[in-house]
Amino acid sequence: MISEKLQNAINEQISAEMWSSNLYLSMSFYFEREGFSGFAHWMKKQSQEEMGHAYAMADYIIKRGGIAKVDKIDVVPTGWGTPLEVFEHVFEHERHVSKLVDALVDIAAAEKDKATQDFLWGFVREQVEEEATAQGIVDKIKRAGDAGIFFIDSQLGQR
């Protein structure tokens, strides 16, 4: 049985993952509107991945005898700048999510819930990849400049 404290913390993370999903969907819509179909595709995939995290966390709570729930999800921004600015925002957002996941691991450790720690370590590892991927895209966009932005757009469309 999962503790109420840990259940509540993971439920908060479920809402955060759903907000992240909406954030990436908003970015996808923006890129579609701006004619960057590859960036839009990448963001849609990212949105689906974040929603998958929310489902996985909800399933985990239920398997542990807890109650999964979705709290209010705040509205996400809709106005974005250049592709570089958007991906810099993505990188900062992923760093924020990493801190949230790290805090969950700390709560699981304090609750002496090894099963939940094990479950959450998968997300810790994934966040390392998410940050590296976002930083890599930022770096590519900076190196490519305006002339290479459509090449990067086409690359990300192959995700």
UniProtKB/Swiss-Prot annotation:
Single GO biological process annotation from the record: intracellular iron ion homeostasis
Protein name as annotated: Bacterial non-heme ferritin
GO molecular function: ferric iron binding; ferrous iron binding; ferroxidase activity
Binding site for Fe cation 1: 17, 50, 53
Keywords from the UniProt entry: Iron, Iron storage, Metal-binding, Oxidoreductase
Enzyme class: oxidoreductase
InterPro entries, A to Z: Ferritin, Ferritin-like, Ferritin-like_diiron, Ferritin-like_SF, Ferritin_DPS_dom, Ferritin_prok
Tagged with keyword Iron: yes
Annotated organism of origin: Bacteroides fragilis (strain 638R)
Entry's induction text: Expression is induced in the presence of excess iron in an oxidative environment but not in reduced anaerobic conditions. Is also regulated by oxyR.
Superkingdom assignment: Bacteria
Enzyme nomenclature, EC number: 1.16.3.2
Residue ranges occupied by any Ferritin-like diiron domain in the UniProt entry: 1-145
